[in-house]
Every structure is written in C-alpha cells, then in structure tokens.
C-alpha cells in the first residue's frame, strides 16, 4: 500500500514486520486473469514490482535471488543440459541459467504472461536472454506442465515461485514434487525458493517433508540476503534423489567466464555451512 508521504509499505502479519520504499510515482498497472501487477519508481531502488500488493523485486537487489536460485544448483549438477523453470516470469532466473554455455535448452513455464510483459517494459535488463535460441517461454499452468513432462527428461528443475498462496499454492505439495521427481533424471536436482530461514523454518521443514514423501532423499537449504523480502534473509532448497552429495564443481565455478554480482565459488563454499540454529530446527 502507498501512504500520503509517498512510501510504498508492505506489512507482514506473519513476521510482525514491514518493508517500505519511498516512491516517486506509479509507472504501470495491469490486472491479469490471475493477479494485479503494479510497477512503481523509487528514489533509491530503481523500479519496484508488486503482485497483489506483495513486493516481488526491485532493480537494485534482485540479483541476490536470481543468482542464488540458479548458479548453486547448476554448479552442483555434474553436467546440466536440460533445465525447466516453473514460474520465473520476470525472466531474471532465465537470464542467469543461460549464462551457462553447457545448458542446451531451458523451458520456462509461468502461468501469467503479463508478468513477463511488465518485466520487458520496466526491467529490460532481466529479459536480455528471452530471445536466446535455447530458451522456450510458455505461459501455462506449471503444475500441469510438470505432470505431463516425460519421465527422466530433465537435469534441473527450478521452481521460481511466489509464496505458497494464490497461483503459487500448488507448487508446494507432494503431488507437484512427485511430478518433478518423475521428470528428473537419476542425477537430477530440484531447487525451489523456500522463504526466510529466520522466521519460516516450519515452512522449510514442511517443504522438505513433502519432497521426501515424493521420493527425494537428500536436501540442502542455502540462505542468502534479499533486502526486499521479509526479514531481509531468504533461502532456496535443493533436493536430490537418494543419498546424494551437494558438493559442487568448484573448479568450474571458480573459472566461470560470465559476470555475477554476488555468487562466487568461495561464497558457494561458505553457504553450504548451515547456521547452527537452522541446523537444529531442520528435520
């Protein structure tokens, strides 16, 4: 919501907190069949996208999220070639994935085309790779897409979803994870945004439990800063089949030829160390 002093403020009842940005005006607004998308201009954080009133991203800090949901999982897999992104309509994750030259194809399936339309207009830097020949952009139900995905056809599934409410609700349960498990090859990896490790460890445990019921046997939750989200600290959770390691291709990561603003091989090594309070709470 905006107040009379030109601040956009989002209140988080579940964490008893709020985040605010000083804005200079609203740039755009669209009501899609699924949700209301708004774009604001801020004084210090570039453009701000909200969906149904919830802050999704800013120009200033989205790189934390997009890099951490993409590069750790891709350097953990031995040789990722076929990638599926569920959600991700702002296309920042797609851009990061396509920095990996070994990736041969990426299918992005987001239910709401208007998110991508708005990203192209107001966050064009995130859409640099939309026309890459390796990219396929679909606007459809991600749950149905994964249910119909051929068995053993995918190396990495990235679930770049909103919170587990509204259109994103069906992406956090056993049935969806079973579809991901089936679509992944034996050495495949699932990664999903998993909310704040400071305030939502219960949700992370619920996610891991549902993934386990679907057949996944190994999990790793990676925390990272994300200033525009509740608590300013976010996470992604990786899941693998069987008793698998989350060691990564450290030499390849260190020798990467593409630019990142946050992710490095050294940082990847550090983020694998789970903070004691998180480790104590995870089941």
From Swiss-Prot:
Top-level taxon: Bacteria
Catalytic activity, as annotated: S-adenosyl 3-(methylsulfanyl)propylamine + putrescine = S-methyl-5'-thioadenosine + spermidine + H(+)
Intracellular or extracellular location(s): Cytoplasm
Q: Which residues bind S-methyl-5'-thioadenosine?
A: 35, 110, 141-142, 167
Which top EC class is named for this enzyme in its record? Answer: transferase
> Which GO cellular component term is one of those annotated?
cytosol
Gene Ontology biological process terms, A to Z: spermidine biosynthetic process
Ranges where the PABS domain occurs? 5-241
Question: What keyword terms does UniProt attach to this protein?
Answer: Cytoplasm, Polyamine biosynthesis, Spermidine biosynthesis, Transferase
For this chain, one GO molecular function annotation is:
spermidine synthase activity
In short, the EC number is 2.5.1.16
Pathway(s) it belongs to: Amine and polyamine biosynthesis; spermidine biosynthesis; spermidine from putrescine: step 1/1
Q: Which residues bind spermidine?
A: 66, 90, 160-163
**Catalytic-site annotation from UniProt:** 160 (proton acceptor)
UniProt cross-references to Pfam families, sorted A to Z: Spermine_synt_N, Spermine_synth
Q: Which HAMAP family match?
A: Spermidine_synth
Q: Which PANTHER family match?
A: SPERMIDINE SYNTHASE, SPERMIDINE/SPERMINE SYNTHASE
Membership in a protein family = Belongs to the spermidine/spermine synthase family.
State the function annotated in the UniProt record. Catalyzes the irreversible transfer of a propylamine group from the amino donor S-adenosylmethioninamine (decarboxy-AdoMet) to putrescine (1,4-diaminobutane) to yield spermidine.
Q: How does this protein assemble?
A: Homodimer or homotetramer.
Name of the protein in its database record: Polyamine aminopropyltransferase
Query: What phylogenetic lineage does the species belong to?
Result: Bacteria, Pseudomonadati, Pseudomonadota, Gammaproteobacteria, Lysobacterales
């Amino acid at each position: 919501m905006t107040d009379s002093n030109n601040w956009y403020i989002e209140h988080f009842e579940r964490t008893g907190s709020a985040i605010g940005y000083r804005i200079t005006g609203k740039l755009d607004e669209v009501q899609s069949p699924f949700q209301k998308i708004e774009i604001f201009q801020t004084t210090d954080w570039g453009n701000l996208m909200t969906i149904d009133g919830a802050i999704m991203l800013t120009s200033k800090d989205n790189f934390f999220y997009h890099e951490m949901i993409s590069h750790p999982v891709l350097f953990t897999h031995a040789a990722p070639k076929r990638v599926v992104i569920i959600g991700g309509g702002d296309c920042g994750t797609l851009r990061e994935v396509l920095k990996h030259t070994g990736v041969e194809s990426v299918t992005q399936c987001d239910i709401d085309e208007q998110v991508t339309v708005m990203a192209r207009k107001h966050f064009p830097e995130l859409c640099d790779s939309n026309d890459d020949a390796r990219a396929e952009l679909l606007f459809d139900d991600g749950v149905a897409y994964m249910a119909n995905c051929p068995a053993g056809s995918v190396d990495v599934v990235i679930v770049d979803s909103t919170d587990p409410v509204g259109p994103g609700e069906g992406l956090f349960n056993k049935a969806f994870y079973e579809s991901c498990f089936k679509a992944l090859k034996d050495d495949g990896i699932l990664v999903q945004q998993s909310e704040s490790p400071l305030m939502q460890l219960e949700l992370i445990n619920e996610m891991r439990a549902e993934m386990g019921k679907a057949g996944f046997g190994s999990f790793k939750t990676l925390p990272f800063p994300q200033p525009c989200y509740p608590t300013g600290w976010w996470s992604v959770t990786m899941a693998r089949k069987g008793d698998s390691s989350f060691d990564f291709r450290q030499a390849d990561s260190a020798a990467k030829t593409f630019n990142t603003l946050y992710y490095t091989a050294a940082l990847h090594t550090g983020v694998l160390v789970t903070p004691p309070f998180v480790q104590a709470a995870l089941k």
